[in-house]
Amino acid sequence: MSDWRLNGQERYPSNAILYKATFPDFWQTAYARKNRFYQKIARYARRHVEATGKGGEFLEGEKIRHFWHEHCEFCWEKATTDTACTFYCTEDLHYWICAECFGDFARRFHWQVRPVEELCGQTNIS
């Protein structure tokens, strides 16, 4: 039986390590520690403000969280920093998978889960 959510994701690496992130807690930790997730958002926000000359007020304090959202790689459910949701992400914070799709496809892709604290504790991001 085919699944409408599968559209070329076969290219995703099998046995990938994913980190379970529960929002808004994940954001609150990132903001407090200024970890790599926070740094990624801050870098994107600064680039946006520099390019457009607008939105500088969002670089102050926790407002910066409004610059980020992602979608599940499979069903396109939206993740935001201030909405209660659980997503799984790759170490580079590039791919995000909602809890439902993770549950449905974890065996197929042989994903492994590590504690998000391992990811949150890292301060550098490429």
Regions found by a protein language model. Give the residues of each.
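Short intrinsically disordered terminal tails
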Residues: 1-2, 118-126
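Short Cys/His-rich Zn2+-coordinating modules
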Residues: 6-62, 81-84
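Short metal-binding segments enriched for Cys and/or His
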Residues: 61, 95-120
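Short metal-coordination and nucleic-acid-contact micro-motifs, chiefly zinc-binding Cys/His arrays
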Residues: 65-71, 91-94
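Short cysteine-rich clusters marking metal-coordination/redox-active sites
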Residues: 72-76, 98-101
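Short functional micro-motifs and their immediate structural scaffolds
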Residues: 79-80, 106
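Canonical RING-type zinc finger of E3 ubiquitin-protein ligases
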Residues: 80-92
